[in-house]
From Swiss-Prot:
The gene is cmk. It comes from Fusobacterium nucleatum subsp. nucleatum (strain ATCC 25586 / DSM 15643 / BCRC 10681 / CIP 101130 / JCM 8532 / KCTC 2640 / LMG 13131 / VPI 4355). GO terms for molecular function: (d)CMP kinase activity; ATP binding; CMP kinase activity; dCMP kinase activity. It catalyses: CMP + ATP = CDP + ADP; dCMP + ATP = dCDP + ADP. One of its GO terms (biological process) is nucleobase-containing small molecule interconversion. ATP binds at residues 10-18. This is Cytidylate kinase.
Length: 218
């Protein structure tokens, strides 16, 4: 039987990571958090004072970066950066870094390599359109901006990050704009993807819906 690839795309705060993790656990699939990969690259560039427009320096940097993911733990050159990659400065810059072609090309290759010969579920912005256009299940999660901001704000509160709801909403809308208008792999629904509005759905509702789609292709 062919390996199953499940692609979950959607804007920031639509519930992609939460849902993807739970689905992976339910079906014993490998979960690949592509957003965390871009966050780790963003962290490296910021901490090494590399300008996002300096493509030569970025290309050099990519050769010195080793990413490792173990469950909810993320390692950048063997250092646990799981908390750091969720900081406000990363949120404000990750969409800019994700729009850089050499960064995208590098990470798309890595995502395909990790997924080779496995049943995987990936979440991101361009999984169903660019990374795995032949994925057997493609879901595009959406939700009202205010609801997505509320979810993100609650996540920040749990992590004791000092930020206001209005700041979260503003940042999220800015990311939506950058993600959907960027030249490289813009955020858009794949033609065959099923769009699911999670604004008024529970996590269980969403998992049940996607699970049925996976069962059909198993």
């Amino acid at each position: 039987m062919d390996n199953i690839i499940v692609a979950i795309d959607g804007p920031a705060g639509s519930g992609k990571s939460t849902i993807a993790k739970l689905i992976a656990k339910k079906f014993n699939f490998t979960y690949i958090d592509t957003g965390a990969m871009y966050r780790m690259i963003t962290l490296y560039l910021l901490e090494n004072n590399i300008n996002f427009d300096d493509l030569k320096e970025i290309e050099k940097a990519l050769k010195n970066i080793n990413l490792d993911m173990q469950g909810d733990k993320f390692y950048l050159n063997d250092v646990d950066v799981s908390t750091k990659i969720r900081e406000k400065r990363i949120n404000e810059n990750v969409s800019k870094v994700a729009s850089i072609k050499i960064v995208r090309d590098n990470l798309v290759n890595l995502q395909r390599k990790i997924s080779n010969n496995k049943n995987v579920i990936l979440d991101g912005r361009d999984i169903g359109t660019v990374v795995f256009p032949n994925a057997k299940v493609k879901i595009f999660l959406v939700a009202a901006a205010e609801e997505r901001a509320r979810r993100r704000y609650n996540e920040f509160l749990e992590k004791k990050v000092e930020i206001t709801y209005d700041e979260v909403l503003k940042s999220l809308k800015e990311r939506d704009y950058i993600d959907s208008t960027r030249k490289e792999s813009p955020l858009k629904k794949a033609d065959e993807a099923i769009e699911l509005d999670t604004t008024n759905l529970t996590i269980e509702d969403v998992i049940n819906f996607i699970s049925k789609k996976i069962e059909k292709v198993k």
